[in-house]
Amino acid sequence: MLECLSALLVLFAGGGGSVLAAVQSKTVADPNLCPGYNSQLISPFLSSCKRNLSECVSRYFDEQYAFCRSCVTVNNETMEDLDNCKCLQCALSSLNNSCFHDYCTSKDEYDKLQIVVEQFQLTNGVLDDGEILKPRGNKFSSRKLSYFVGQNNTLFRNPLQFEKNQLISALLTSLTNNQKTISSVDMFEVVDANNEVQYLRERTISGKTLSPATGYEEENDGDCSVKDKKWEGKIEYHENKKVSSENCSKDTDDKSGSKKERNTKAPLFHTATEIHMTRWSSWRPKKIFTRYLVNEYQSPKIITTVNRFYRTKTDTETGTTLITSTKAKRRWFPRTKIVTSTATSTFLSITTTTTTNAIATKSLVAVLNPDGLNKKAGINFGLFSANGELASPDEGGTPTVVRRDKISDPGAANEQATLFSTTFSQVPHLPELDSGEFISAASQLDERIFIFTAITVSITTLMMLGFSYRSRVSFRDHSIDDSDDDNDWSDDEVEFDEEYFYSLPVSIPEKGISLDKMAQQLGVE
């Protein structure tokens, strides 16, 4: 067998560089692989169960929990089996819930089984049935071997059929006090010193060989190279003995000289091939073939990896374009400009007011000559004629028209008012005068008339004050007896001397302006 295996490895490694990796795996079929389970501490108690109890446990093994199909915990780096606690949990659950009442009859044994299950759950904890496992493919995966990723990137794999059968058999053996009641299963043993290949132990009972181990397909006795039907020709059986046309498994032991015929079944190998497309060149991609030689026995696993690498010549054309960029830095001085917008609204308001007042004419008598009191001259402040005669009392009043312009500025909050006044005076017709020009007194209301009027009023007021005050009389000349006489201001007791009369510079204009000129100055059309 070793010669056949060596020849097979040389065949795979002949095309290119090869890497041979041997992964030492722990025994999944051993219940003691679970840290919380020790078969030596459990006293066997099963004795009333049927022989085919293991078949029932194996049949309902996968139906207990969702993780029973991938219950072996694997190391992510070394790909070694860490523990089989979940597989052991599935086997105990299948025995307790599905098979005990149909294959066993003792109630005491059932009570002891409940104690074992409870102790296992207390030691290992309650296993999570709701954990979602995602498939993960790698170079160790095959049609019978699948890997899954759980929480915290924990890696799991499915137990092979013979591993599951051996685990169930070992569990029932540790719980049974009479091993004859449990159906025997085929066991594996290591026959070579290097643990590279493991053979199936053969047993001869009454001149017949045992049936193949559980999990393998039937083999053809007449053909030496039997292929598994389920694997469709990808699983090969290899013989390590000389093959003859009559019997493929006959061999003679040279050392012992025994001529006993032995029927030996070689370990099961299969080859997995992965093809990868290179990305070194987009127009000439290359294929990389990776082949794995996998031994599906539990221990050890021999994996042969063949990698072929190709060298690709790549021509690269590089075009260079020179791009020159110039950056100019300019200093900017910030400037602040304040723009003020002012809105001005002008409203024109024209108010026309017509007022007619009767002008009363009074005469103020003033003494113009200091020599006598007989000659008097009348000064008329109303309408008068050019010859200085007093105006007639029948002369009418003067209509006055006043126009007021108002300009309002809402923005500046200013208000300007312009007053235009126009006075129309009428001079009555004097039929007794044959010649001469009738002049209105309103025509004399210019700047000189106003000054003349103000001076006249001031002088008149001073004269009235002078009449009521005697400058030459002192307070010492009066006595208390004369105080009553001083309060008498009757006209008959007033005497005027020449010292009390003064000449006034009174000038009366002889001629006024015309109506047209006065209207032009006043701006009346």
Curated annotation (Swiss-Prot):
Membrane spanning residue stretches: 449-469
Side of membrane Extracellular, spans: 22-448
Compartments it resides in: Membrane
Membrane topology summary: Single-pass type I membrane protein
Intervals, Cytoplasmic compartment: 470-525
Region (Disordered) residue spans: 242-264
UniProt key word Transmembrane: yes
Signal peptide as annotated in the record: 1-21
GO cellular component, one term: membrane
Keyword vocabulary terms for this entry: Membrane, Signal, Transmembrane, Transmembrane helix
UniProt-recorded name of the protein: Uncharacterized protein SCRG_04024
Species in which this protein is naturally found: Saccharomyces cerevisiae (strain RM11-1a)
Lineage, top ranks: Eukaryota, Fungi, Dikarya, Ascomycota, Saccharomycotina
